[in-house]
């Protein structure tokens, strides 16, 4: 044996640098420990608290499973990292609890709100809102690539329309342009297929999608575009309902592509072609970035852009 006290053995195995003991004794203690298959105990790190600020109310989140999926992914990923996540719906606190280690903000926030959040001087990451101009980290969807995928499909059609929605920031102070609409419009202009009269904007709901397509059918009649890009699946499903009510065949007469690949997209009839957004990646990558900030491992401000994928189903021609 090493002929030392239990306390000395413990301090050597815990690598206590303040302990005054010879190298030979240290080596002997480690040799004996290894022969006994000693494994150093891993200290459990204390749970760190994260504040998740949601731009929606709880009811609005129930109506929009896109943002619900992001939040749930963050909570599940947080458990694996010993993070305790508290969600505040549709509000920004005036002050923070001292033990809050970082903040994640989901949704769309005005410049004033971003400034308000930055004043807490805590690690801060925005999900689904590019805040590079405000010098804040963010994780967003790559809309450029998504629209390229839609355009590759739209190229098969001569007449093309768009059904979209308008959003405002959580405090209602800024109206936000939808990048899907702007990018799609620019791409159609470049291809010579842009028709301003075939672009319709309402809200991001099934009811709005149905109303917008009703309007398009009324205004265009037999010249109704043969292809519509819809800014989310809810709009596309509402549009499909309108077409079916008017006895207009999908996709034989009109093809539709949605956005997000929500859970219901595959179950409507015909099953909806859509751009798939990895909401789990948005949530988990956002949380990873926040933890990196909390650990001091990130230097410059970052925006991480998540790729999308076109899921072809029965609402577009083969």
What are the functions of these language-model segments?
Residues 10, 45-61, 159-170:
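Short beta-strand segments enriched in small/hydrophobic residues
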Residues 51, 99-106, 161-164, 199, ...:
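Periplasmic-binding protein-like
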Residues 65-80, 172-194, 208-212, 238-242, ...:
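Short, solvent-exposed amphipathic alpha-helices that sit
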Residues 139-164, 178, 206-215, 277-295:
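Hydrophobic alpha-helical segments within soluble ligand-binding/sensing domains
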Residues 149-194, 302-315:
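An alpha-beta-alpha
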Residues 218-318:
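Flexible loop/turn connectors
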Residues 1-46:
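N-terminal helix-turn-helix DNA-binding module of bacterial transcription factors
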Residues 48-152, 218:
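Alpha-helical recognition/docking segments in bacterial nutrient-uptake
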